[in-house]
């Protein structure tokens, strides 16, 4: 029995050990040879990470990270992504390393990456520890607000030698966000209920990116003061909160969202139902803490204030 960084391999299981150990050894040798060109960075949860300069094979552990890497022109360096990394179109052809919350260690190691980028708000701590345990540099980001998304973009640009591209991208995002703020500054803020779960009905509370998007889009989140980030909601409570607008997010892929929207119509005590202000928004635009979130903000602003003079670039 061989104990390798907490992983046990039996001599009786040759196929499993070869499939896992050999790629790990290759990665360790590759990383050892690249150490001379490594630079030390502090990631967003305070960990020290040695990263080759520049990294040439990057594995992304979240759709938001994948979108950021592609936005910085790093498509050739992206060696692997998660299952729901579908944007941009070129990301669909990249090797998959598992789901957002269930990453396959063997698949990541088998891609021989010299950098793995994960997120604290989604990836499991055990996953990061396992990847570290086999010698992989794992840089963790933690964007849960628009300001932190900008910081993430700049950080990823810094560790991948794309600082100029990152700065240009962030400036463009800030310009679009300012345009929205100016356009909506003097408009009345309607009350908004955002539905991001079907069964049970779930919404977004305080401390979430969704809550910030509603506010920046000129609305008031009717659950914005709840201490829970993603609380379950009863229909009675939603009626009591009298939302002027209901926005249904297509969070569960394959759901019959027109039917969900129509299902609200029997609750005509709700102002949003009475005034026929029930809308559907693409979840990918508001769920991923990536540069594309500005598209989600613009779309949400158009929903909440359809008569405004908001201009999209």
Model region roles, listed by residue range:
Residues 39, 56-122, 222, 267:
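A short, structured surface patch at a secondary-structure boundary
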Residues 105-112, 134, 233-242:
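Short helices/loops that flank or line small-molecule/ion binding pockets
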């Amino acid at each position: 029995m061989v104990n390798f960084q907490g992983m046990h391999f039996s001599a009786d299981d040759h196929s499993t050990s070869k499939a896992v150990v050999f790629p790990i050894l290759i990665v360790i040798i590759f990383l050892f040879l690249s150490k001379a060109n490594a630079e030390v960075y502090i990631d967003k949860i305070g960990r020290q990470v040695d990263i080759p300069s520049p990294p040439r094979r990057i594995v992304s552990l979240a759709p938001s990270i994948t979108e950021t890497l592609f936005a910085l022109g790093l498509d050739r360096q992206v060696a692997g992504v998660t299952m729901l990394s579908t944007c941009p179109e070129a990301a669909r052809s990249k090797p998959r390393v598992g789901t957002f919350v269930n990453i396959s260690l063997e698949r990541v190691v088998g891609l021989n990456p010299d950098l793995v980028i994960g997120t604290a708000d989604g990836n499991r701590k055990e996953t990061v520890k396992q990847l570290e345990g086999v010698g992989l540099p794992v840089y963790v980001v933690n964007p849960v607000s628009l300001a932190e998304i900008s910081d993430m973009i700049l950080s990823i640009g810094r560790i991948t030698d794309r600082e100029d591209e990152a700065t240009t991208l962030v400036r463009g995002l800030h310009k679009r966000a300012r345009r929205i703020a100016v356009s909506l500054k003097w408009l009345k803020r309607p009350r908004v209920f955002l539905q991001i779960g079907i069964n049970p009905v779930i919404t977004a509370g305080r401390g979430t990116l969704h809550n910030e998007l509603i506010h920046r889009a000129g609305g008031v989140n009717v659950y914005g003061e709840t201490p829970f980030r993603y609380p379950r909601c009863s229909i009675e409570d939603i009626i009591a909160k009298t939302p002027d607008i209901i926005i249904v997010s297509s969070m569960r892929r394959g759901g019959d969202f027109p039917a969900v929207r129509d299902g609200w119509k029997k609750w005509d005590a709700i102002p949003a139902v009475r005034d026929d202000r029930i809308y559907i928004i693409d979840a990918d635009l508001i769920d991923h803490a990536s540069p594309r979130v500005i598209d989600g903000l613009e779309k949400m602003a158009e929903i909440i204030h359809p008569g405004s003079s908001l201009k999209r670039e």
